C-alpha cells in the first residue's frame, strides 16, 4: 500500500507537467509562465496535503488526550471507591480517634467528589442510627467509653451540617434518615434539606433547625426532646417546610419555637405534647384544612394564607 505522501508527490509532479504542458500549447504563454503556473498547481497539492496531515495529527492528539482522560477518570473513580470502602470499614474500629478520622475522610471525599455527597450523608446518618446511650441522659456521670463514643457522634453531626448546602441555594436538598437516632446539640440551622426522617429520635440538649428549608417531607413522628439536665430546647424559627411537616406524637420537654416559620404543605401536631410553652407567632400556613395545631393556638386568615395566633 502506497503512502499518502507518495501519492501527493505523484499528483504534484503530474500537475506540474500537465498544467505546464497544456499552457505551452498556447503560443501566447512563455515557457517561464507555464513552469510557474505548473509549479503553483503542484505546490497547491502539497499544501493541501500538509493541511490534511496537520488535521490528522490534531485528531490523533485529541483522541490520545481523550483516552488519557478516560484512564484518569477510571483511576480516580477506583481510588475514590477504595477510599470510601476503607473509610466505611474503619467506622467499626475500636479506637475512637480512628472512627473520627474515618468520618473526616468520608466528608473529604464528599467535598472533592460531589456525586458522593448523598452516599456519604447516608453513611453518617446510619452511624448515628446505631444504638447508643449515655449515663448523662439520666443525670449520671458516663463512662470513659460512652464519652469517647459521644465525641465521635458529635463529629458526625457536625460533618452532616457541613455537607448540607446553604438554605439560599436553588434545587432540592439531600435527604437525611435519622430514624431512631440519639442526637445531642443537633444543629442544621440555615441549611437546605430534602426529606428529613426523625421518627422516634431522641433529641437531647438543644435542637436547632432555624432558617432551614425543607424541600421534601419532614417527619418528627414520636420523636422526643430530652428531659432532665439535658433539657431539649427545640428551635425552628424562620424555617420553611415546602412539603409535609409531621409532628404527630412528638414530645417536647422544653420550650419549642416555630416563630416566623412557613408551612407550605400538610402539617399536623396531632398528639404532640408540650411540657413548656410553644411559640407560633408569625408562623404561616398555606391551607387551614390541612393543619392541626396544638391546644392554645388557632389559625387566622392573613394575606391569602393563614397565621397562627394564641387562643
Residue ranges and their predicted role:
Residues 3-82, 89:
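Membrane-embedded hydrophobic alpha-helical segments
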Residues 70-73, 82-107, 111-138, 142-311:
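N-terminal leader/targeting and pre-domain segments
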Amino acid at each position: 500500500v502506497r503512502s499518502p505522501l507518495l501519492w501527493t508527490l505523484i499528483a504534484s509532479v503530474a500537475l506540474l507537467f500537465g498544467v505546464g504542458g497544456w499552457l505551452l500549447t498556447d503560443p501566447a504563454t512563455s515557457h517561464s509562465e507555464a513552469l510557474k503556473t505548473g509549479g503553483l498547481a503542484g505546490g497547491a497539492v502539497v499544501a493541501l496535503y500538509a493541511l490534511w496531515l496537520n488535521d490528522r495529527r490534531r485528531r490523533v492528539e485529541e483522541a490520545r488526550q481523550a483516552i488519557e482522560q478516560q484512564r484518569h477518570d477510571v483511576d480516580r473513580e477506583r481510588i475514590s471507591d477504595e477510599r470510601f470502602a476503607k473509610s466505611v470499614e474503619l467506622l467499626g474500629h475500636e479506637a475512637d480517634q480512628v472512627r473520627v478520622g474515618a468520618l473526616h475522610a468520608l466528608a473529604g471525599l464528599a467535598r472533592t467528589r460531589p456525586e458522593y455527597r448523598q452516599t456519604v450523608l447516608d453513611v453518617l446518618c446510619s452511624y448515628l442510627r446505631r444504638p447508643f446511650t449515655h449515663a448523662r441522659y439520666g443525670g449520671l456521670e458516663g463512662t470513659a467509653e460512652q464519652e469517647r463514643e459521644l465525641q465521635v457522634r458529635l463529629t458526625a453531626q457536625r460533618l452532616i451540617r457541613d455537607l448540607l448546602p446553604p438554605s439560599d441555594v436553588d434545587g432540592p436538598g439531600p435527604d437525611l434518615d435519622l430514624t431512631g437516632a440519639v442526637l445531642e446539640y443537633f444543629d442544621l440551622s440555615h441549611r437546605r434539606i430534602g426529606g428529613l426522617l426523625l421518627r422516634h429520635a431522641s433529641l437531647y440538649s438543644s435542637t436547632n433547625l432555624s432558617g432551614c428549608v425543607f424541600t421534601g417531607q419532614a417527619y418528627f413522628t414520636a420523636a422526643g426532646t430530652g428531659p432532665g439536665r439535658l433539657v431539649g430546647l427545640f428551635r425552628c424559627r424562620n424555617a420553611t417546610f415546602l412539603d409535609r411537616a409531621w409532628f404527630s406524637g412528638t414530645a417536647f420537654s422544653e420550650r419549642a419555637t416555630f416563630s416566623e416559620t412557613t408551612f407550605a404543605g400538610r402539617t399536623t401536631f396531632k398528639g404532640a405534647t408540650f411540657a413548656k410553652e410553644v411559640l407560633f407567632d408569625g408562623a404561616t400556613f398555606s391551607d387551614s384544612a390541612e393543619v392541626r395545631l396544638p391546644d392554645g393556638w388557632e389559625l387566622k386568615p392573613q394575606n391569602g394564607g393563614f397565621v397562627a395566633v394564641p387562643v
